[in-house]
Amino acid sequence: FGGKEKMLALGKYPEVSLADARARRDEARKLLANGVDPSENKKAVKVEQEQEAITFEVVAREWHASNQKWSASHSARVLKSLEDNLFAAIGKRNIAELKTRDLLVPIKAVESSGRLEVAARLQQRTTAIMRFAVQSGLIDYNPAQEIAGAVATAKRQHRAALELNRIPELLHRIDHYSGRPLTRLAVELMLLVFIRSSELRFARWSEVDFETAMWTIPGERESLEGVKHSQRGSKMRTPHLVPLSRQSLAILEKIKGMNGNRELIFVGDHDPRKPMSENTVNKALRVMGYDTKTEVCGHGFRTMACSSLIESGLWSRDAVERQMSHQERSSVRAAYIHKAEHLGERRLMLQWWADYLDANREKGVSPFEYSKDKKR
């Protein structure tokens, strides 16, 4: 070909029969007659066949395996979500042939079922998988980039929180709650440390260090048999440090006297091997006379604490955000904040918040006024 003698292997006998070899020879002659190099054509066909074998599922599994920093449980959840929602529709498709409209089909199906948060996560993961394909040299362009805005976002749920001038009323109702003592202490502690519900109800005694006055909520907890979601630790899946005020330590000491021999801090009403119900705090607030949808709910304590700390003007935004355990969008800034921790300031801040609540037991005072009084 091209004035040069070339050899073309037709296959080994007996794997390739004589009849097949003759057919391949004849095909090669046809290619030569059309000005096509049979050996180069053979290579091109082989490359094409290899590319056809690179499916969305193959790439998705490689992307999944590359995320080695994920916890085992999170990794398993991500893979199951891909298997349940994406692979059946586009898993066997050649990664290079997928268009934006193809990627949207399974995501829109999930959206149509009303699972908007799941659809949003699938959109993010599909984009990441296709980006991985670009970075791996499998495709030149990421068609998932065009999905942005095509999937409805879940309506942000409003968490009811009291106006700060109603804090004295809330404290009075907590102090006079006549239900289960452990429930009253749970509500009071949740207000003092303003952590999330699952972070509180799945808490273990092993996480609390009374000597250093520190509660370390792990990124993931050991699962409790028969208890759904009991592996949940901090929402950000990294250890969250909660400095304990004198008031918080006193509450934990009281609880320790009740069930310090148990693994869980907040044991269930009927079975001490299981945690209190996820509805315990909100149910107690309803017993106190509050509408947990319009007035205040357990999660609303976080809003009240955050508003008070900012209004006081005493604390840096970084310290407040770190204690709230909010996700920092900038990875560079997140790394800085995580490393710095602001622990010294946060210790003072949590003690100030506890003292501020005590001051409101005597008379109503705003965070700003209380901070001015403390400075005098």
Regions found by a protein language model. Name each.
Residues 50-57, 93-101, 138-142, 153-172, ...:
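DNA breakage-rejoining catalytic core of tyrosine-based enzymes
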Residues 1-8, 33-40, 50-113, 129-132, ...:
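Basic/aromatic-enriched alpha-helical hairpins
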Residues 145-152, 202-254, 328-331:
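Conserved tyrosine-mediated DNA breakage-rejoining catalytic core shared by Y-recombinases
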Residues 168, 172-184, 193, 242, ...:
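Short, basic (Lys/Arg/His-rich) helix/loop patches that form interaction surfaces
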Residues 30-43, 97-101, 131-154, 218, ...:
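Short, charged hinge/linker segments at domain and secondary-structure junctions
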Residues 70, 110-125, 135-203, 210-211, ...:
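Basic, Lys/Arg- and aromatic-enriched nucleic-acid-binding interface segment
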Residues 153, 161, 217-225, 249, ...:
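Catalytic-site neighborhood detector that most strongly recognizes the C-terminal catalytic loop/helix
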Residues 141, 207-214, 294-295, 314-337, ...:
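Short, polar N-cap/turn motifs at the start of nucleic acid-interacting alpha helices
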